[in-house]
């Protein structure tokens, strides 16, 4: 039996202590030997990112997961800084920038609104696929395989039972993310 893919879970939430949904989602990940949970706000509260260290972590893993809340149709500021600095030209893109080619990218996102708010005729005016397009484009720029995002809509309003169900499914996927049904 082959080993499961090594997963780097980049977690970015500036108020993690207040996010019940994200804490529940993280729990199964912390119990899996093939998953490295890397809390960006815990490591870089001053936003001074150790770029060589982050790039080394990326090289060591096959699947990169970005878990974060949706903030103003994007990600928290530190994750945006991380993306801009770590996925640099010559490392992840451009001439010689093939360090992430063939790896897998997946966003795992919590939102404050229901799924129905993400439509052309609704509150947010665009479907989630449009909102997340910059992440998909970044994955393509890095020559990574884009995996459909996991989205927990209206995260604060999910019951404990619903969150536990999401966490189980997420944990099952993390345990073997590249299995035939996992992509």
From Swiss-Prot:
GO CC entries: plasma membrane
Topology in the lipid bilayer: Peripheral membrane protein
One of the Pfam families matching this protein, by short name: Flavodoxin_2
Highest taxon above the source species: Bacteria
A molecular-function term among this protein's GO annotations: FMN binding
Key words of the record: Cell inner membrane, Cell membrane, Membrane, NAD, Oxidoreductase
Compartment annotation: Cell inner membrane
Catalysis performed (reactions): a quinone + NADH + H(+) = a quinol + NAD(+); a quinone + NADPH + H(+) = a quinol + NADP(+)
Annotated SUPFAM superfamilies: Flavoproteins
Broadest EC class assigned to this enzyme: oxidoreductase
Major location category of this protein: membrane
GO biological process: positive regulation of potassium ion transmembrane transport; potassium ion transport
Quaternary organization: Interacts with KefB.
PANTHER family named among the record's database cross-references: GLUTATHIONE-REGULATED POTASSIUM-EFFLUX SYSTEM ANCILLARY PROTEIN KEFG (PTHR47307:SF1)
Function: Regulatory subunit of a potassium efflux system that confers protection against electrophiles. Required for full activity of KefB.
Full protein name: Glutathione-regulated potassium-efflux system ancillary protein KefG
């Amino acid at each position: 039996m082959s080993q499961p893919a090594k997963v780097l879970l980049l977690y970015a939430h500036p108020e993690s202590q207040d996010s019940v949904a994200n804490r529940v989602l993280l729990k199964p990940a912390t119990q899996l030997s093939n998953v490295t949970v890397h809390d960006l706000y815990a490591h870089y509260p001053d936003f001074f990112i150790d770029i060589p260290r982050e790039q080394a972590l990326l090289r060591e893993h096959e699947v990169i997961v970005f878990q974060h809340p949706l903030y103003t149709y994007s990600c928290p500021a530190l994750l945006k800084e991380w993306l801009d600095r770590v996925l640099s030209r010559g490392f992840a893109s451009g001439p010689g920038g093939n360090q992430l080619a063939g790896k897998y990218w997946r966003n795992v996102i919590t939102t404050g609104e229901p799924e129905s708010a993400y439509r052309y005729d609704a509150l947010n005016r665009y479907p989630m696929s449009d909102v997340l397009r910059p992440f998909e484009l970044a994955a393509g720029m890095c020559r990574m395989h884009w995996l459909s995002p996991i989205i927990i809509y209206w995260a604060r309003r999910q019951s404990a039972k619903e969150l536990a169900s999401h966490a189980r499914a997420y944990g099952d996927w993390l345990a073997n993310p590249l299995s035939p049904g996992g992509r």
